[in-house]
Amino acid sequence: MCSISGIIVKDNQISAKYSIDMMKILKHRGRDNSGLLLDDEVIYFNDFEDVEDLEEEMIGNLSLAHNRLAIVGRYGVQPIPNEDETIWLVCNGEIYNYIELREYLKQNHEFRTDSDNEVIIHLYEEEKLEELDGDYAFAIYDKSKNVVRLARDMFGVKPLFYVDRDKYFAFASERKALWHLLINIDGCERDLDELNSKIKTLKPNSQLIYYLDDNRFEIIEGFKKLELNYMKERSYEEAKEYLDRALKNSVLKRVRGLDKVGIICSGGVDSSLIAKLASLYCEVILYAVGTENSEDLIYAERLAKDLNLKLRKKIISEEEYEEYVFKVAKAIDEVDLMKIGVGIPIYVASEMANEDGLKVVLSGQGADELFGGYARHERIYRERGEEELKKELLKDVYNLYKVNLERDDHCTMANGVELRVPFLDEEVVEIALSIPIEYKMSELSNRPYAESNISLKSEPINGLKNTNLNIKCVRSVRKKILRDVASQYLPDYIAYRPKKAAQYGSGGEKMIYKVAKKYGFSKKRINEFLDMLKRKIVSEF
């Protein structure tokens, strides 16, 4: 959607060059226009060449900066002030209930823009930030109170990082912008692990309040509360109806105002359900990525045909995979084998979406954590019981930001495309986490499941709709209630397809080892290959 960044200098003033350099580093996140507040002076511009002469001339103690990817509103350039310019905002994100909030707030406030983000300023003035429904990371500078307030959405869909050093405090949407300060102000070595060790993540559902008078800050966690008794004593059919309705509402909120949206589609139940629901409200394009003969491509292709949805697919060659390994590592600001393997299909899908002129894609991220989709969830349920699995799912949801969401955001935004995740809507999460465990994990017999080695040339199988896929019967199923909701919209070969990790379904795991081997590193020496990647990332920075 956008990038935000800012610097608070603790003693002497600093030139605008550092803030503008950070904006340049984050430009891929928002190419439509940019804005910078430096103390009391504000500049808006479309091209960094327009501000070259100001980089050294402008100095100050505090900056807020923004690069915009315009999605909602034509006149949403930031930083945005309140009516008397005593409060300034920069925000990365989308506010899904902004129309309703705007209607309420305009009774006492004057709006300057048609941006969804502007409601944040006036909610802050009304002390009602908890009414926000959206995915966001923002910074507010309140001159009257002499504070800067950072905040992040409930589940951390939008990233926000910060550093606190002797000379300055700074924040940014991506760590690479903070590397620039650590290297050029603090003189830190170009060592990826060392640089990242100095950077902290603002946790989801948290606010950081920086007091400018004495250069200190405090963090307030859990400023919004989840209602986890939502589905208490509901029958299975009632729970299905609630979940179905909430998912449709969530998808509708995330495509409102869009004529066309992309879906990062693996051919699994999660992304396929989101695709089908989105197609009820706007045009949908599926983006599927994998290596030659990867399962995800085969399933996605069949799904697109059966549901009459447009599909763009990309088969990644070994040579291309090498290129994407480096691109993804650079995008996510870290070197982690699993994150790179999962990130490559996301990166390539968003690259294709950008080529098609799309600014928004949806994914099925979060469903496994909410409904018990991993093998370890079933194992915990069998061995340790329902209460332990409840705790595990809750922990997984709150850890999504560092395990998956920051990676996914960086991979899509590297291509100027915003990712939205309907499963992490607050109402959907409240319903999912309060659904009884036995509705998610159950003993079944004779339930059709698509096999891994599918054959599209085989004869149709009785009992499966719209498919020629081979099936087998299994005794247990994870994500039962979600699969049963999905079966109302999708062929059974998708609704009941077994879980397969993205890096395996796309064929990427094996390909990464091939890339490492090309550089002289065997599978046993994969960590040496990763170390080489780390050096390459920071050397090119």
Swiss-Prot record:
Top-rank taxon, per record: Archaea
Transmembrane regions: none
Protein name: Putative asparagine synthetase [glutamine-hydrolyzing] 1
Taxonomy of the source species: Archaea, Methanobacteriati, Methanobacteriota, Methanomada group, Methanococci
Catalytic activity: L-aspartate + L-glutamine + ATP + H2O = L-asparagine + L-glutamate + AMP + diphosphate + H(+)
SUPFAM superfamilies assigned to the protein according to its UniProt record, in alphabetical order: Adenine nucleotide alpha hydrolases-like, N-terminal nucleophile aminohydrolases (Ntn hydrolases)
Binding sites annotated in the UniProt record for L-glutamine: R68, L69, A70, I71, V72, N92, G93, E94, D116
GO biological process, one term: asparagine biosynthetic process
Positions annotated to bind ATP: V289, S363, G364
Residues of the active site: C2
Enzyme class: ligase
Family note: Belongs to the asparagine synthetase family.
Organism field: Methanocaldococcus jannaschii (strain ATCC 43067 / DSM 2661 / JAL-1 / JCM 10045 / NBRC 100440)
InterPro entries in the cross-refs: Asn_synth_AEB, Asn_synthase, Asn_Synthetase, AsnB_N, GATase_2_dom, Ntn_hydrolases_N, Rossmann-like_a/b/a_fold
Annotated Glutamine amidotransferase type-2 domain residues: 2-213
